[in-house]
Amino acid sequence: MKKNYIFIILFTFFSIIGSKLFTFALSFHVLKITGSVQAFSNIMIIYSLIFILGSTSIGYYIDKINKKSFIISMQCISILSIISIFLIPNSLNQLLYIYIIVIILTVTDMAVSLTFNSGLLSLVSERFIDQTVSYRNVIQNVLQIGAPILGGIVYAYFDIKTFMIIMFVTELISLIIVLNIAFNKVLAKKVYEEVKDTFFNSYKVVFKFLKSNKDIFLILLSGSIINFMFGFVTVGIPGSFVTIFNMNSKQLGIIETGFPLAGILFGLIYPKLKNKGTLVANMQVAMIILAVGILILCIPFITDFYKLSILVIYFISIFIIGSGVVLSNVPINIYVQKNVPEQIKGKYLALSQTMSQVMMPFGILVAGILFDFNSVFYIISFSITAILCFILAYLYTFIKKHDGVI
């Protein structure tokens, strides 16, 4: 299991860094060859649509098939598609081919990610699950900061094909790592034999499970609500920072590092904590931290500050918000791994991912309309989101006292 744990950490690094670098370079490349923001926006739309429409379908199948064979096949498809696009003359200067490669790589990345997440506990055991979830989170946050910096340096000297070569190498390394991971073959066979139902009936099993397990239902429901409200925060932070307080893109980049820095710090600390507390306690503290971080965002709207003070306030706020998000997400991911049955875990994770992909963009859409209508909605939305976090913290207490879950 320790060998699997090490291989999964390595796989996480190589699979993410290749995708991050290519996505970063592709955004600049599309804007360069078309001069159209809409062409770039289409890539984001494709990405979101694939996650919304494809997650539940993939979740249905990965609970029924051999996970290792499926991951290997997805990695092979990624590698072959990269080779094909690379060999087609002038393909990366044509939007059609760019959209095709984006679709293929998004589908394969999503499929591999869901498959790994659905079988994580069986791969590393309870002994290493805390470290696996936490350190994967650290890698994601490190690359969130590092990949754009590295990508910018590489893009200044090399063209988009260089990034395709880098991605080909990282995907090939990821494939070699997967081949060395020992999957639980007995479990894969058991799931394949037991789950022989239609698509809709199989998800009825998931909803039945949620109905009888209030703790898992609470995680799914509160996550959806928070994702919707965080659409306002996601748009509101850069929107208010630039348009209301007249800050520049460099300063925006500085404050946005606060979130991944919080993720890195907490991800390194969490596995070493001896008393991690209950899930409800963690979620309560996380909601309070989120509320405090969001309320701090309201301070510059109330009184006048120098630009440096606004920069510091926003950075502190984002760091606190990032701490609250990670304090919530890491224990939740570990809890889900331990308490959702393997036979439906893929479908549950797919359902959760689909709801997140729907709720946050919807929140972003509503926020954009309101913020364009009147800037007063910045402080209103921040205040409402903070109040909602306090309400959720209280509801967790009520459930713990009266229903005895978690």
Task: Show where each model-derived region lies.
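C-terminal transmembrane bundle of multi-pass solute transporters/carriers
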Residues: 53-57, 64, 68-77, 84, ...
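Transmembrane alpha-helix termini and helix-breaking/packing motifs in multi-pass membrane transporters
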Residues: 27-33, 86, 146-166, 243-244, ...
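Extracellular/periplasmic helix-loop-helix junction of adjacent transmembrane segments
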Residues: 25-51
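A single, central transmembrane helix in multi-pass transporters
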Residues: 25, 160-164, 202-267
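Helix-breaking motifs and short loop linkers at transmembrane-helix boundaries and internal kinks
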Residues: 34, 66, 88-92, 300-301
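Substrate-agnostic recognition of the 12-TM MFS/MFS-like secondary transporter fold
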Residues: 7-23, 47-60, 66-78, 97-156, ...
